[in-house]
Structures are given as C-alpha cells and as structure tokens.
A protein has these predicted regions:
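Glycine- and aromatic-enriched mobile tails/lids
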Residues: 24-25, 30-42, 55-58, 62-64, ...
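An anion/pyrophosphate-binding glycine-rich loop and adjacent beta-alpha core
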Residues: 256, 262-390, 461-465
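Conserved redox-cofactor binding core of oxidoreductases
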Residues: 133-220, 232, 276-289
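Glycine-rich Rossmann-fold phosphate-binding loop(s) that bind the pyrophosphate
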Residues: 47-50
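Conserved N-terminal glycine-rich FAD pyrophosphate-binding loop of Rossmann-like flavoproteins
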Residues: 72-105, 271-275, 282-286
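Glycine-rich loop(s) and the adjacent beta-strand/alpha-helix scaffold that form part
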Residues: 228-283, 287, 355, 438-461
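Core beta-strand elements of the Rossmann-like FAD/NAD(P) dinucleotide-binding domain
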Residues: 39-41, 219-228, 423
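Short beta-strand "acidic-cap" motif of Rossmann-like dinucleotide-binding folds
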Residues: 65-70, 266
Length: 644
C-alpha cells in the first residue's frame, strides 16, 4: 500500500535572511490594496472560532467586504470556547528567562523538528501583540495580587509564559474576538451567516472563487462568490469518534477543499492529550478534557505494583510510582503531551492502571492543597474541579482525579505556504485547519496563540498581496462552476437520503473510531496501518449500502448533517492511515512501534523524513500522490528531544 509515485517539491515561499528578520522583510515586500479599493473586494471566512472571528474582524476593520459562515447557532458556540488552560506569549513578565527565541525553540523542539522554522518564529514574534490585543478588548486574563497579568507553566517549557482566565481561557478569548467581529457586523463590513455549512469549494480557472453551502434550517443549497476564501474550520480528531472535540467538529470543509486541489499535509500527526476523563462505557459519544494546566499542581501516579486495587488514600507513598517525575525529572509532570500520554499508556499496559478496566492514572492534588490550601487551588482551577465532579461524582479536592489519554488536536491540516495560502491560489487556511506551526506535537497553550496570530496579525498582510493581483468581482455566482457545484452537492444529499439502510450513522462512526484508535492511535506499526487501510474501505462501502438517514433535505435535519460528515471521515481516515504508513519513523505524536530508542522514546529518521508530506487527491479510484516540502533547521539544529 506504500505510495510509489515520485514526490514533487513544494515551495513554502520562505523569506530569505536571518530568521528574526524574515517576517518584517516579507511584510515590506507584500503588495498592498488601496484603502478606497478594499470595499470592492469580497472575502469569505468559513468558521468563526478564534482564527475565523479574528480574521473576519481584522479584514472587516480594514474595509474589505467579509462574508462569515458558521454551522453553529452563534459564533460563540465555536469549539474554541472549550479551550481551558491558556495562551502562550513571550512577554517574560515573571522575569524567568523567557524570550521570543526561547518560545521558538520550545515550540520547534516540542514538535519534534517537524515544523517549518520560519512560521514558528513568526508565531513567537507576534505572540506578545496577541496579549496586548486581548487586554485592549477587555478579555479578563488572570492577574496577580498587584494587578499585573499573571502567568503559569505549561508542558514542554521551563518558564512560565501562559496567560489564562482560570479554566475558561478559550471562552474569554473567543468572546473578545467575537465582539470585535460583531462590531464589524454592526458597521456593515462583515455579513454573518450562522446555521450554514460549507459543503464545497468552488474553483474557477485554478483559483478559489467561492463556496457552496447548505442552510441548516431550510435545507436550501446556495453558492457565494468571493475574491478569496479563508478556511478556519478547526481540526479532524473526531475521526476517532471518541475525542475531546465537540460532536459537531468535522473535516468536511477541509476535505472538500482537498478534493478540489488543496493538498493535505501530515494527516497522521494527531495529538493524544494525556489528561482526559476516561471513557465510562460504549454508550459514550465524546470525552472531556481536563486542562494541562492542572499538571502545575497535580501529580500523576499509579500503584507501584500491578493488581494493587486499594483506594488511592490507602496506598502509601512508598507504593506509588510518580511516573512522569521518575521518567522526566527536568520537566516532571509538565512533560510534553505526546510523551506523557505514552507514559500513561505504558503503565496501564503493565496492569498498573486504575479505575474501571484499568485505563486510568491518578492526578493528585493532595500535596498542592496541603502546601497552598484548597482556596488557592479553587481560585486557579475551580471550574475544572466542578466539571470533573459533575461528570464523575467525585470530589477532586479529597480524592485524586482519574485521567487517561484521548484524541484532542490535529497538527496536520491543509498545506499552506508562509502566506497561509494553500496549493489553490486564493484559498487561505488559518488556525488548526492548517498544518504549519506545531510539527508532530503541539505544546499546550499554543493552539489559541496560533489561531489568533493567523487571524489578527498574518492574514491581513498576506491576503492583501493576493487581492492586489486580482480584479475585484471578476467571477460571480453566475459562473457555470457554481451551478455545477450546487448540482454535485444536491446529488450527494439525495444519495444519502435514498440509501434507506438499517444501521445508524453513529454505528458507522463508532466502528470507524474503533479502527482508528486500535490501528492508528497512540501507537502504530506498518502492520496496523495496513490493517486499517484494508478495513476502512470495506466499512465505507457498507456505509453507502446500509446507512439509514431519516427525514428530508428540505428542512432542519441533524441526521443528514451527521451523515455527510461521517461520509467525509470515512474517506479522510484512509488518507490518515496511508500517511501513517508512509512516514516510516517515529516523531512526536506519530509513534511507530518499530522505531524506538533504547529507552522507548521516539526514533526519528531525519535522512528520509525531515519533510512535510502533502497529499494530492486524485479521485476515488486512484491512490493519492505525495508531494514533499523539505524542512531545514538553521537556527535550531536537529537534535534528539530530551526532557529528562
């Protein structure tokens, strides 16, 4: 099943010169649009989470005509709202040695040297401005006793650089971006389309010129034309069925763009988050994240011996294994997510896991409560403790939390160059929907940073460069490509409704998730990837023969929405497994069991795989073709990650 085609080299359009000057130089080189002409250009923004709302707000403020789409009832329901722990920025307020260069180094190292250096440095460079923007918007970031902005630590760093709003950081930052966007809605520069789902990208003469959508209330299929399109639609880890993502999170917009010519980069780079509430049974439809910030004060441990079923309070210190402190003494409980997740799986596989099925480890706050008092811990994490008790019925102030790794974030995404432009001219991809900044493993508190960096501080410059070379309104929705797109979407809708099978959509999604978790999950191998590649097409064929989609297409129909998303997951999952088989190394969250160092850590193969693998869709009857973008590391030389 390995891909045998000759790879084509992709140009990331990386600026020349020293890394600290690249972004400043490029901004000076980019073409501009006359302020009086900006209102003649129309930009579509799909998705209104942190990346989408900040992009729509920024572009509207500049004077462009923006059409913003989201499938939620309100932009405030975007999944960015679920981010808990915080946002990184190189402000060095604690005076503990942080800098732009150190944030850059930590991020590249955390991603196991599989991210583009120039993009990561730019991210670190603009991080401080994000905090200034948020404060100016009134985002209630935590402050210390003196009134200064407070910081806490996160995984993979030896400094405190994470700004936060208790355990609701994503929600508060999203409200700031949302208010900025709604200001532009009021000003008339942004037009909002809620309850509207993108189902196709319209490409005319090789360039992105609009989208086709379905009104989720009426079922009406419509097309919208624009001079550029920004996809800000998040990640795809719901391909595993059970994940920390909201049930509505999907790959549909990105996958439909891929099928129109946008290459999909590194889809096998998926993050398994170490601190989630363990699954309680097969009836479950999603998992709940417990913020990484909890590991500032919580200690991860399991019984020292297999089969020890005593209550946690009855197990003395000498019979406990504080596994992260033992394995990674320099970083302790704040080791990066990929290695922390594998460490938890390792002890559970040894029979030392806790809770039902032995699939859990303890996250214990007793020492911190004894040192600081329960009131201090409540002030830092109160809403998280309340959430945990609501779900489990257990009081984490008196007994340790039980946690276990779960699918959480997608480092892979649509390939973009330094301008955030995909392989389709005019299609820009922001936030988690692109691949660019996190390599093979994202550090905690960096997702919010990337989404807002892309939306507030990158896309306003780079999209202008594209638009300055485009005649406004050159293509309208009257072009035949839009009618063809609508016809194709309507045909797929009718096909789904006409199957009339016996199995539910959830049944197929759960079956796909089991294949993915078992064969392409936390640990993979060539054999397991091949098994997934054999089973996914068979399941997909069953779906199109035996799924039952009730209702009609001319009204609100949640089953129809879910059926289309699962159909896309059934196609995308095959690409993810193929990429995992192709990447014959271990790096970050992509852990191939054949490739381990003697101590069990990931063993990279820089000679063969120090590159981005971007996949070109060639139709349902042909294997996708891989294209590569070589990665060079000049500022931070390649090295084996070491958190010990």
């Amino acid at each position: 099943m390995e891909n045998k085609s000759v790879p084509v080299l992709l140009d990331g359009k990386i600026p020349a010169g020293p890394i600290e000057q690249k972004w400043d130089r490029r901004r000076e080189e980019l073409r501009l649009v006359n302020p009086a002409n900006k209102r003649t250009y129309r930009v579509i923004v799909v998705g209104t989470g942190l990346a989408g709302a900040s992009a729509a707000a920024s572009l509207g403020e500049l004077g462009y005509q923006v059409e913003a789409f989201c499938f939620q009832d309100s932009p405030r329901r975007a999944h960015s709202i679920a981010a808990q722990g915080g946002i990184n920025a190189a402000k060095n307020y604690p005076n503990d040695g942080d800098s732009v260069l150190r944030l850059f180094r930590d991020t590249v190292k955390g991603g196991d040297f599989r991210a583009r250096e120039a993009n990561v440095y730019r991210l670190a460079q603009v991080s401080g401005a994000i905090i200034d923007q948020a404060v100016a918007q009134g985002v209630p970031l935590a402050r210390d006793y003196a009134g200064y902005l407070d910081n806490r630590s996160f995984g993979g760093a030896l400094v405190s650089r994470t700004f936060y709003a208790r355990g609701q950081s994503g929600q508060q930052l999203l409200l700031g971006a949302y208010q900025a966007m709604m200001r532009q809605v009021g000003a008339g520069t942004v037009r909002l389309h809620p309850r509207t789902e993108m189902l196709d990208l319209v490409v005319v003469d090789g360039a992105a010129r609009g989208i086709t959508v379905r009104d989720l209330l009426t079922g009406k299929i419509e097309s919208h034309a624009a001079d550029a399109v920004c996809l800000c639609t998040g990640g795809y880890t719901n391909v595993f069925f059970l994940s920390t993502n909201a049930q509505g999170c999907n790959v549909t917009a990105a996958w439909r763009a891929c099928k129109r010519g946008a290459h999909f980069a590194n889809p096998c780079f998926t993050q398994i988050h170490p601190t989630c509430i363990p699954a309680s049974g097969e009836h479950q439809s999603k998992l709940t994240l417990m913020s990484e910030s909890l590991r500032n004060d919580g200690r991860v441990w399991v019984p020292l011996r297999a089969g020890d079923t005593r209550a946690p309070g009855a197990i003395p210190e000498g019979d406990r294994d504080y596994l992260l402190e033992r394995k990674y003494p320099s970083y302790g409980n704040l080791a990066p997510r990929d290695i922390s997740s594998r460490a938890a799986k390792e002890v559970c596989d040894e029979g030392r896991g806790v809770g039902p099925g032995g699939r859990g480890v303890y996250l214990d706050f007793a020492a911190a409560i004894g040192r600081l008092g329960a009131a201090t811990i409540r002030g830092r994490y109160g809403n998280l403790f309340e959430m945990y008790e609501c779900i489990t019925g257990e009081n984490a102030y008196t007994v340790p939390m039980r946690i276990y790794p779960a699918p959480h974030y997608a480092m892979g995404g649509l390939w973009v160059d330094y301008h955030l432009e995909s392989t389709i001219p005019g299609l820009f991809v922001l936030g988690e929907a692109n691949f660019s900044d996190h390599g093979a493993n994202r550090l905690g508190a960096s997702a919010l940073m990337q989404g807002l960096a892309d939306g507030y501080f990158v896309i306003p410059y780079t999209i202008a460069h594209h638009l300055a070379q485009t005649r406004p309104g050159a293509v309208t929705a009257a072009h035949p490509a839009f009618a063809a797109s609508r016809l194709e979407v309507e045909s797929t809708t009718k096909r789904l409704l006409g199957i009339g099978g016996r199995r539910t959509i959830t049944d197929f999604h759960r079956a796909l998730g089991q294949i993915m978790w078992e064969h392409v999950g936390m640990t993979r191998s060539a054999a397991s990837c091949r098994e997934a590649l054999a089973r996914i097409p068979a399941l997909r064929a069953e779906f199109w023969e035996d799924v039952r989609v009730v209702g009609s297409g001319g009204t609100l129909n949640r089953e129809l929405e879910r059926a289309g998303r699962v159909a896309d997951f059934l196609e995308f999952a095959e690409l993810l497994a193929r990429d995992a088989l192709y990447r014959d190394e271990s790096c970050g969250g992509h852990f191939r069991s054949e490739h381990q160092l003697p101590d069990g850590e990931a063993k990279r193969d820089d000679a063969r795989f120090c590159h981005v693998a971007a996949w070109e869709w060639r139709g349902p009857e042909q294997e996708p073709r891989v294209h590569i973008e070589p990665l060079s590391f000049e500022t931070l030389p390649l090295a084996t990650r070491n958190y010990k």
